[in-house]
Curated annotation (Swiss-Prot):
Protein name: Large ribosomal subunit protein bL28
HAMAP family, sorted: Ribosomal_bL28
Family of this protein: Belongs to the bacterial ribosomal protein bL28 family.
Molecular function terms, GO-annotated: structural constituent of ribosome
Gene: rpmB
Source species: Beutenbergia cavernae (strain ATCC BAA-8 / DSM 12333 / CCUG 43141 / JCM 11478 / NBRC 16432 / NCIMB 13614 / HKI 0122)
Length: 63
């Protein structure tokens, strides 16, 4: 699944958009997922990582 972080397993959350007249329509909030080349067990690999994991330094970037 492309909208899931491979590090922390963050995934989309679901809810409603509520208009002024209180009409509810279903919608989803996606996490900010980026494709990043990282080092996993000494080999570079491409992972889907959320930006909160990138800012926290939970992955090591491959150059």
């Amino acid at each position: 699944m492309a909208a899931t972080c491979d590090v922390c397993a963050k995934h989309p959350s679901f809810g409603y958009s509520v208009s002024h007249s209180h009409v509810r329509t279903k919608r989803r909030w996606n996490p900010n997922i980026q494709k990043v080349r990282t080092v996993v067990n000494g080999t570079p690999k491409r992972l889907n990582v959320c930006t909160s994991c990138l800012k926290a330094g939970k992955v090591t970037r491959a150059l």
